[in-house]
Amino acid sequence: MKILIVSDTHRRNENYFQVIEQLGKLDLVIHCGDTEGSEYAISEGAGCETLIVMGNNDFFSKLPREIETTIGKYKVWITHGHNYYVSMNNEIIKEEAVRRGVDIVFYGHSHRPTVEIEKDIIAVNPGSLSYPRQEGKRPSYVCLLYTS
């Protein structure tokens, strides 16, 4: 199963469509929020199932604030992250993920890619394809290959 995880595209979808083309056939796209109204284009461009949550810039959106689902044997929580102060650090969101009993949390908001693997939780922020903030400011995403 090939899964693309993105966040914070902020209606600038050119890099997203390039990544979709480069990766080829996908089984799932997860968007961790801040589409700014372009969720239809993101879903249609994916060519597969798409899970999108609302970010702090998705005003008037009918997107869900959070999604809990499963991928294979893993319980997954998808959130934008702004309600868990991820711009400061990742401790609160990781604590909440453990409290919820999930294995993996996907989140965005900070525009900085991070992957943290700890005993109780895997926390993944794909960064931003449109407005990266990490050193070097390269657009980022995560491609997850899952085999059962």
Regions found by a protein language model. Name each.
Residues 51-56, 60-92:
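Helix-adjacent hinge/juxtasegments
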Residues 10-14, 36-40, 57-62, 84-88, ...:
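Active-site environment of divalent metal-dependent phosphoester hydrolases
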Residues 1-49, 58-65, 137-140:
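N-terminal active-site segment of His-dependent metallophosphoesterases
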Residues 51, 87-142:
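Conserved beta-sheet core of the metallophosphoesterase superfamily
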Residues 5-7, 28-33, 51-56, 78-80, ...:
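Active-site neighborhood of phospho(di)ester-bond hydrolases with catalytic His/Asp-centered motifs
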Residues 146-147:
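Conserved small/polar residues in nucleotide/adenosyl-binding loops
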Residues 12-22, 78, 85-97:
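Pre-active-site segment of Zn-dependent metallo-hydrolases
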